[in-house]
Amino acid sequence: MSAVVRPARSGDEADILGLIRALAAYEREPDAVVTTVEDLRAHLFADLPRVFAHVAEQDGRIVGIAIWFLNFSTWTGRHGIYLEDLFVDPAARGSGIALGLMQALAAEAEARDCARLEWAVLDWNELAKGFYRRLGARHNETWEPWRLDGAGLAALQRSAVGDALEATEATEASEAREGSRHPPEIAGMIDSS
């Protein structure tokens, strides 16, 4: 039986999470997934969602996922779709499910007037690279993906807060020395109230 590709709906979260975990295992990161069913429900089905999913359903079972979000190109002045995860259950592969999911995203891109559809692929995943080449996609050799997360992200956030706090403290100290933080013509009116 062929698969039906459709937007994810409430109630799909557990199946989606199962496929996310299977993808993580395939990508040699089986313990990396901390997302919960509740996280997926909160993000995929929020009043104004910022992440979306399409699923492929075969014989009443979800066997494929495409999880995506909108990004924006300042050069084209248009949104794009970034495909975060594409995965098909290995038992269901070879029946056009991945192609159907990508076609659904291409239709979303057209409906939303998006300039592009983009994603990242692991350097060792030759099977995926071959599939994407057959779609007509090309590897962008100019841009390298970079990421800041975990301790590095926290350290940057702390340094930004620290810098802002230092600047605020310096401003307050300067104002205290000068007696007012307001121009002389209005200082008396504001500082005395």
Question: For each of these PLM feature ranges, what is it?
Answer:
Residues A42-V55, Y82:
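A short helix-loop-beta-strand connector motif used in the catalytic cores of GNAT acetyltransferases and
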Residues L86-R93:
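A short, internal acetyl-CoA/4′-phosphopantetheine-binding micro-motif in the GNAT/acyltransferase core
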Residues L99, Q103, D123-T142, L148:
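Conserved active-site alpha-helix within GNAT-family acetyltransferase domains
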Residues L17-A42:
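Conserved GNAT-fold acetyl-CoA-binding loop/helix
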Residues E110-A120:
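Conserved GNAT acetyl-CoA-binding A-motif
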Residues A56, G94-M102:
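Glycine-rich acyl-CoA binding loop
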Residues V4-I16:
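A short beta-loop-alpha structural element at the N-terminal edge
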Residues V55, R61-L70:
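Conserved beta-strand in the GNAT
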